[in-house]
Curated annotation (Swiss-Prot):
InterPro entries noted in UniProt: YbaB-like_sf, YbaB/EbfC
Purpose of the protein: Binds to DNA and alters its conformation. May be involved in regulation of gene expression, nucleoid organization and DNA protection.
Name used for this protein in its record: Nucleoid-associated protein cu1912
Keyword annotations from UniProtKB, A to Z: Cytoplasm, DNA-binding
Subcellular location: Cytoplasm, Nucleoid
The keyword Ribosomal protein is annotated on this UniProt entry: no
Domain of life the protein comes from: Bacteria
GO molecular function per UniProt: DNA binding
Organism of origin: Corynebacterium urealyticum (strain ATCC 43042 / DSM 7109)
Any Gene Ontology CC annotation: bacterial nucleoid
Length: 105
């Protein structure tokens, strides 16, 4: 069995780098919606992890129970963050398996 030559290895590395950059661009361009309280609190994260929007249904705003509202906001953020991580894994995960093990990144 012959060893791959340096040109093949470099071409593979360049393809992988391009695919990685494309996957990163897709993730950054995404908006992820997280929800809590059956949609009473929604939070939108950018693909870069920044909060873009927060909506709170008036029904869950109770001055006597601020703690519940805080929990709902945290829950919506955690939901959006998990979805963002899942998206990143979906887009970037396959890149680690390219080329019979790929290159370490």
């Amino acid at each position: 069995m012959s060893q791959p030559n340096m040109n093949d290895i470099m071409a593979q590395a360049q393809r992988m780098q391009k695919q990685l950059q494309e996957a990163q661009a897709e993730i950054v361009a995404s908006s992820i919606v997280g929800e809590a309280g059956n949609g009473k609190v929604t939070l939108v994260l950018s693909g870069g992890g920044e909060v873009q929007d927060l909506k709170i249904d008036q029904e869950v705003v109770d001055p006597e129970d601020v703690e519940t509202l805080q929990d709902l906001i945290i829950g919506a953020f955690q939901d959006a963050n998990q979805k963002l991580q899942d998206l990143a894994q979906e887009k970037m995960g396959p890149l680690a398996d390219l080329g019979g093990g790929g290159l370490p990144f």
